[in-house]
Amino acid sequence: MRIKFLVVLAVICLFAHYASASGMGGDKKPKDAPKPKDAPKPKEVKPVKAESSEYEIEVIKHQKEKTEKKEKEKKTHVETKKEVKKKEKKQIPCSEKLKDEKLDCETKGVPAGYKAIFKFTENEECDWTCDYEALPPPPGAKKDDKKEKKTVKVVKPPKEKPPKKLRKECSGEKVIKFQNCLVKIRGLIAFGDKTKNFDKKFAKLVQGKQKKGAKKAKGGKKAAPKPGPKPGPKQADKPKDAKK
């Protein structure tokens, strides 16, 4: 009985396995079958770049070069604008620069019976003068009433120049204080320089001058005593034991 049961069970299992295999195969479609039009297209997955870091570096480098180029162009544009402005300032004639001065000359402080004559020279400083000339007498006036010609010059004051720097004297005979001794030395030594330009020759010369000065000081004459009462003889000190 057991053997029959096992055989039947094996047959059932084989049948079930065959049925399941045939059902799965039936659902499969052939490879060359045409796809339906309404089916959604699968998304294209872009492959990941292995050298992504190098690509990013190249992009950054390109952007940097682009910004540097723009900055250079801006600088050149600004510089050209500045140069154009400088040229325009330089090319302004003196007649335009001295408009206010001319107006002041012709309107302010003009005496009666005189007219203002404004003159200027076309140069960098635009020097100008304001003269006053007497007007001609009217036709009905007498000849005796002639007015003397009067000219008044107003000169533009000169610009104050900065004082020149005094140069150090670097040649000729100099008196230099060296080791509390005034020594005259001829040579290229700047005044007040005590150590930098002293070489062996000058040091020897200084030593020789010092020795000569010391000898003269020793062999000099003694000063005469001042007139006055002579001091008396000093009294001898008494011994301490005499009191006892």
From Swiss-Prot:
Residues 23-91, 137-169, 206-244 are annotated as: Disordered. Residues 1-21 form the signal peptide. Residues 156-168 are annotated as: 3 X 4 AA approximate tandem repeats of K-P-P-K. Keywords: Repeat, Secreted, Signal. It is found in: Secreted. Sequence repeats lie at residues 29-34, 35-40, 41-47, 156-159, 161-164, 165-168, 225-228, 229-232, 233-236, 237-240. Residues 209-224 have a biased composition (Basic residues). It comes from the Eukaryota. One of its GO terms (cellular component) is extracellular region. Changing L166P: In allele A:2. Residues 26-86, 157-169, 235-244 have a biased composition (Basic and acidic residues). Residues 225-240 are annotated as: 4 X 4 AA approximate tandem repeats of P-K-[PQ]-[GA]. Salivary gland. Residues 29-47 are annotated as: 3 X 6 AA approximate tandem repeats of K-P-K-D-A-P. Used by the larvae to construct a supramolecular structure, the larval tube. This is Salivary gland SP38-40.A protein. It comes from Chironomus tentans.
